[in-house]
Amino acid sequence: MPLYIHALACAFGLGSWVSINGLWVELPLIVNVLPEGWDLPSYLTVIIQFANLGPLLVTLAHKFCPGRLRENLAIYAVLSIGVVACILLAVFWNYTTVIFGQPRSTAFFILTFFLALVDCTSSVTFLPFMMQLPAKYITTYFIGEGLSGLVPGLVALAQGVGMSKCVNVTNVSDNVTDPGPSTFIVETQYLPPNFSTEIFFSFLAVMTTISLGAFLILNRLPRTFELSTENLVSDSDAVATVCRGLEDPMDPKTNCPEEVEQKQNEVLLPKPQHSSYQLAFIYVMVLWVNSATNGLLPSVQTFSCMPYGNMAYHLSAALSAVANPVACIIAMFFPKRSLVFLGILCLLGSTFGGYNMAMAAMSPCPLLQDTPLGDAIIVLSWVFFTGLLSYVKVMVGVILRDRSHSALVWCGAAVQTGSLLGSIIMFPLVNVYHLFKSGDICNTNCPL
């Protein structure tokens, strides 16, 4: 029976962020089809920030109507919406409508918003439900949550990416009386991947359905909830708790057993001491890291990677998705709380991010284009950028978690502020001022 519940807890956690993670790793195939092209990621970063309306509403409900919001019904709703949105996305993802004379991916954007709403809201509903189960199942839940980033990345690697080829196309005039000479142009054509985008989105729907099914069974299990240390998140799960991303700036789980136990023991357990300068450094680091990883760099990943080819972009997106949960696992087994060490990692990760941004600014003719070395460097740069800053995010969150509840609340606020600022800054630079230039593999002539 316990193994059965462990499997259910893992499957339940799998549905937390599988949809949005799946969208990001599928972008290398989508940007070649949808009219927004290379600008598409900048739209997604803004849409995801708007989707934080979900956890905000849940937080306000807990604040002003304590005890009125039934979390099991909220979970039913968000997972059901996720399943329906994934199914609709598999059918309508490439449907466009004309807005102000330009084709726009309206269906894709609307469905992406609902998927982001589901995943963001899961951050403030799934864990409170899991707190009703014994603590040993919470670790398994976090494993499933980590798999929500790992599994789509691995499936995307298995899917592959449509390789591009340059094809000569003859254009013949439609004028019958005076046809004129034929013109020859070179077009970029993309070969199909191992399986289609529709199948990939259907896979996301299946994963979300599995999560919903696991929750249905977990919610019907008989359970007794006692106010004891067995039902608390253990110290070994501290990293895993923070690894969820600290999506909500205000913790809705008031009066939970963990908080009661913490208040009972706060006199016995000494809190870590940091000077005001150290705390300022920590919060600036949180602000910067989340701005870079959730807004600034994702908005220009296409411009950074696509000039090196579809394969480079595909590997960068998929391996970066894998690097995030791997960094969380490393943080669980090798936690380092030294601010000097974390500052060095932040600087190193930011250096890789700076290289990625520089290549995006140089698009469509970045350094070492059309060379195996250039392809390898850009892929590794994105992987190290994501992995290093993910480790920093987790460990900084752990430091603030051990300090106090209010410190963790301010950490969540810094996470959201940084992510929002990064998205807002990049959107006009990409879509209004067009500082980043897209290109075509077959028709872009770069100086030697």
Curated annotation (Swiss-Prot):
Coiled-coil ranges per UniProt: none
Biological role: Plasma membrane transporter mediating the uptake by cells of the water soluble vitamin B2/riboflavin that plays a key role in biochemical oxidation-reduction reactions of the carbohydrate, lipid, and amino acid metabolism.
Protein localization: Cell membrane
Keywords of the record: Cell membrane, Glycoprotein, Membrane, Transmembrane, Transmembrane helix, Transport
Superkingdom of the organism of origin: Eukaryota
Annotated family: Belongs to the riboflavin transporter family.
One GO molecular-function entry: riboflavin transmembrane transporter activity
Keyword tRNA-binding: no
Chief site of localization: membrane
Residue intervals passing through the bilayer: 11-31, 40-60, 73-93, 107-127, 138-158, 198-218, 280-300, 315-335, 339-359, 376-396, 407-427
Gene Ontology cellular-component terms listed: plasma membrane
Organism of this sequence: Danio rerio
Catalytic activity as recorded in UniProt: riboflavin(in) = riboflavin(out)
Protein's UniProt name: Solute carrier family 52, riboflavin transporter, member 3-A
InterPro entries xrefs: Riboflavin_transptr
Sugar attachment sites: 94, 168, 171, 175, 194
Keyword Flavoprotein: no
Single GO biological process annotation from the record: riboflavin transport
